[in-house]
Amino acid sequence: MSEELPIKFTDAAADRVKQLIDEEENPELKLRVYVTGGGCSGFQYGFTFDEKANPGDLEIVKNGVMLVVDPMSLQYLVDGEVDYTEGLEGARFFVTNPHATTTCGCGSSFTI
């Protein structure tokens, strides 16, 4: 029986993280997803690389790479999906959040 994770980490996102980590030649890097106040809708998503997971962080391993989320951000990301896309608007990581009642045009800020 598999344990249901509170956030989905897509293959596309994990594969891109792996490529970026390989380019940096630092296998300790993890993708950290976080939520901060700001943006045009009240909250905004952030993505950064971190060499460590902090106590209490959610850790999701996929395709040999780790996604980490702090407990405060996790409450805003439950049932969401971290994905990666490349298109006419450029390449970016993004979050699909079913609990967001409003999102801005670029998709990086939201309201719950």
Swiss-Prot record:
Give the source's domain of life in one word: Bacteria
| Xref: Gene3D superfamilies | HesB-like domain
Role played: Required for insertion of 4Fe-4S clusters for at least IspG.
InterPro entries from the UniProt entry:
FeS_biogenesis, FeS_cluster_insertion, FeS_cluster_insertion_RrpA, HesB-like_dom_sf
Q: What is this protein called?
A: Iron-sulfur cluster insertion protein ErpA
Per the record, the similarity remark reads: Belongs to the HesB/IscA family.
Per UniProt, what is one GO molecular function of this protein? 4 iron, 4 sulfur cluster binding
Q: Name one GO biological process term.
A: iron-sulfur cluster assembly
Q: Which cysteine pairs are joined by S-S bonds?
A: none
GO terms for cellular component: cytosol
Question: How many cofactors are bound and how?
Answer: Binds 1 iron-sulfur cluster per subunit.
- Quaternary data: Homodimer.
* Cofactors named for this entry: iron-sulfur cluster
Q: Where, by residue number, does iron-sulfur cluster bind?
A: 40, 104, 106
Keyword annotations for this protein? Iron, Iron-sulfur, Metal-binding
